[in-house]
């Protein structure tokens, strides 16, 4: 009696659901390894796995671009499938690299991805031959010029997808590139800008037309209020998320919250500057999430927060005053999550167990970490779970099977 050799094929719909569920946004390298292996299982799995691999791509050199261009060649069905799968692209423009990605190639790569929603672009100033560390955003490099985008490159970008999210890190002294990029994409909803603070040109352009939903800033020195007024002219009623990775000046914080507190739902800052900071935050009556990285939180802050709060994230060291936070947790009917960044000595705080008990009794999820980068990521993910679908991670094309 012979054994049956009939094979039962797993339905493709089930395979798609399983692989899509396995996609891990926060560990792009693990995605490369996982889906490269999945692509080798069989022909049916290969197309599904490769589409997931191409969901987020990274281009750092002309070599990367050539490989990517060949893979997404739109004259072939496979190329169109992979190009259509791209949702997020991370690009580095650095003329100091041996085989750097040209601006024209960057623009062509964007046009090959009609469904792309998110672009993360880093630009570095061009220096004379020397002892540069490639990709290092040090002070000297930030004083170097980077070429502006030429008209042909800008025209190419305008023929590409209408992206919703732009992250631009400018490590050069050329402020015009930011204004060029913002002029290309008139439908942006999310903007993250860092590096050298932009300067408005002498002949100020028309106010930025986009109604932004989210803004994140991390400049070496504070931008001028005139720039913020220009950038957020049409975002008074739309800005829901504001993330300031460096401490703003009192005047800047006062200006931002005076004009945007009404719609703001998520606010992140390194510190809360005493009475002035508390008074500014008090204006945010629709706030759902607050993240303060400093281990010192003014005791009056918790009383200033609205009843709409769902997530609070803060730092803890040995001297952090926790009683006001404990009281807020106990009385809140809307709080869903608490995130704690444990600073040096914070693990020995005498009221840390009381915090755990208060969260457990109220059914509030408590998360903690000693890594500030993980702290920021956790805080963002909590609010993102039901508010955002913008992509913020990437996968290198180097691991894709061509």
Predicted stretch roles:
Residues 2-6, 13-25, 279-402:
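Leucine-rich solenoid repeat modules
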Residues 3-102:
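Hydrophobic regular-secondary-structure patch
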Residues 12, 16, 20, 66-76, ...:
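Amphipathic, non-transmembrane alpha-helical secondary structure
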Residues 18-26, 33-35, 121-130, 195-197, ...:
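Short regulatory "switch" loops immediately downstream of catalytic or recognition motifs
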Residues 55-57, 84-91, 116-119, 162-166, ...:
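Hydrophobic beta-strand segments of well-ordered beta-sheets in folded domains
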Residues 57-68, 97-100, 174-175, 199, ...:
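Acidic-and-aromatic substrate-binding clefts and catalytic sites of carbohydrate-active enzymes
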Residues 70, 95-266, 270-282:
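Leucine-rich repeat
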């Amino acid at each position: 009696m012979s054994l049956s050799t009939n094979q039962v094929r797993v339905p493709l719909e089930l395979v798609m659901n399983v692989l899509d569920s396995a996609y891990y946004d926060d560990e792009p390298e693990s995605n490369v390894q996982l889906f490269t292996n999945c692509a080798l299982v069989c022909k049916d799995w290969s197309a599904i796995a490769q589409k997931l691999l191409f969901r987020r791509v990274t281009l750092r050199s002309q070599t990367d671009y050539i490989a990517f261009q060949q893979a997404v060649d739109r004259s072939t069905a496979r190329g169109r499938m992979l190009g259509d799968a791209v949702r997020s692209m991370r690009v580095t423009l650095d003329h100091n690299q041996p085989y750097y990605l040209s601006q024209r190639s960057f623009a062509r790569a964007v046009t090959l991805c009609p469904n792309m929603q998110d672009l993360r672009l880093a630009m570095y100033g061009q220096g004379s031959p020397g002892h540069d560390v490639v990709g290092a955003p040090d002070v000297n490099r930030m004083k170097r010029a980077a070429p502006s985008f030429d008209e042909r490159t800008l025209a190419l970008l305008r023929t590409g997808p209408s992206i919703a999210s732009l992250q631009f890190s400018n490590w050069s002294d050329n402020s015009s590139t930011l204004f060029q990029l913002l002029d290309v994409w008139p439908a942006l909803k999310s903007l993250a800008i860092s590096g050298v603070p932009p300067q408005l040109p002498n002949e100020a352009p028309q106010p930025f037309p986009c109604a932004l939903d989210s803004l994140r800033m991390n400049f070496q020195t504070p931008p001028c209020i005139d720039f913020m007024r220009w950038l957020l002219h049409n975002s008074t009623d739309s800005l829901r998320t504001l993330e300031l990775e460096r401490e703003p000046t009192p005047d800047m914080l006062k200006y931002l919250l005076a004009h945007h507190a009404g719609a703001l739902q998520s606010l992140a800052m390194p510190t809360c500057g005493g009475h002035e900071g508390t008074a500014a935050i008090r204006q945010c009556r629709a706030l759902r999430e607050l993240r303060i990285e400093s281990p010192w939180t003014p005791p009056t802050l918790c009383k200033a927060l609205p009843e709409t709060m769902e997530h609070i994230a803060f730092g803890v060291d040995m001297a952090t005053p926790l009683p006001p936070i404990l009281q807020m947790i106990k009385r809140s009917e809307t709080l869903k999550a608490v995130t704690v960044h444990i600073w040096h000595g914070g693990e020995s705080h005498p009221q840390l167990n009381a915090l755990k008990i208060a969260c457990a009794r109220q059914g509030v999820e408590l998360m903690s970490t000693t890594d500030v980068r993980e702290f920021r990521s956790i805080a963002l993910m909590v609010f993102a779970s039901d508010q955002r679908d913008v992509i913020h991670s990437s996968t290198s094309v180097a691991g894709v099977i061509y």
